[in-house]
Amino acid sequence: MTPLFRKAVWLLFAVSVCAFAGSLAAQYVLGMEPCVLCISQRLCVLATALCAAVVLACKPKGRVGGLSGAVFISIPAVTGISVAAYQLWLQSLPPGAAPSCGAPWTFRLKGWPLFDWFEPVVRGFGNCAEPDYLLGVALPVWSAAYFLAVVLTVWWAWARAK
């Protein structure tokens, strides 16, 4: 792993941890109620941070190792982009025309081991079709911008690595 690629992955790890902490702060400090799709995006942010940590721990060697690391980090980021795009589509529909966004995560994961530890991360019953804003921009737009920045950064760092 080249120094540039390693620095980029460290940056992505740090930004992902901050974004995850920010999503928890928005829920538990600011009182914003996340919906099922918001929680899915939160889990994609957490997965991006964990993938970056795994890449840093494994220290991939050479161009192919960097490629595998870039792909590994990109998977949850691309998933997050698709979830954010779907939520933006739901929010663009006329009131009452949006389909349900599914069962709450707390219901889906209730019987899983260690659920009590994980439950604060997936708690939320907000409406997916009702937009929340930060600085005048819908939260799924911020989420999509974050995920796009992750993908562009990791692939830029991989392409620049020699």
UniProtKB/Swiss-Prot annotation:
One of its GO terms (cellular component) is plasma membrane. Residues 26-43, 86-141 are periplasmic. The chain crosses the membrane at residues 9-25, 44-60, 68-85, 142-160. Its main location: membrane. The keyword Disulfide bond applies. One of its GO terms (biological process) is protein folding. It is found in: Cell inner membrane. Required for disulfide bond formation in some periplasmic proteins. Acts by oxidizing the DsbA protein. This is Disulfide bond formation protein B.
